[in-house]
Amino acid sequence: NVNEELGATAVMGSQLAGEQPDAKYDGVVGIWFGKAPGLDRAGDAIRHGVYAGASQHGGALVIVGDDPAAKSSTVPSSSDLALMDLHLPLFYPGDVQDALDLGRHAIAMSRATGLWTSLKIVAAVADGSGTVDVSPDRLSIVIPDMHVDGAPLIHHPDSRLLPPHNLDIERDIHTVRFERARRYVAANDVNRITVPTPDARIGMASTGAKYHEVRESL
């Protein structure tokens, strides 16, 4: 079926809606969800949405369910490289609380940068449970300075995906939108040092569910 492609195209439309002169709302949050095979299927539609970009009052989030042990899938899956190829900054939660926190960061980053963002949910997290803090004050999201050479970097979604304009859009993704994403990550301490040791000689980096497995093994 074409559900995945239609869903991604609808999310693209949600980001363009706020740019219309008769828009009723400042922006719309668009969220796409699919397992790894759905991401494979919807790649072209998502790529077009990424190029068009996200609204500063909306935000576009791609949530992908990965099943690395093929627990309920025909083949094992890991979507990291596919998401990277689609120019989607990747948030990888390790538990249910992480999924809520990083999901909020992903939407906030999308609004601040004009990028679509992604959230990778592995089977262990999707099937997991836990007590979570849902207070709206749990996160203090910081929107960093987005000026370059004194000019504000505000992205306006654009569906003119034809030459030569599409080449300008690709340049904007790599030179402007990615820079915004780096500033967001730094300002919000997204990549944390969780066991600070002043005299450390060796560091270990891990993400998502594997982070908790590494901590447990140590």
Model-predicted segments: where are they?
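Thiamine diphosphate
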Residues: 1-112, 122
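Flexible, low-complexity linker and terminal segments
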Residues: 93-218
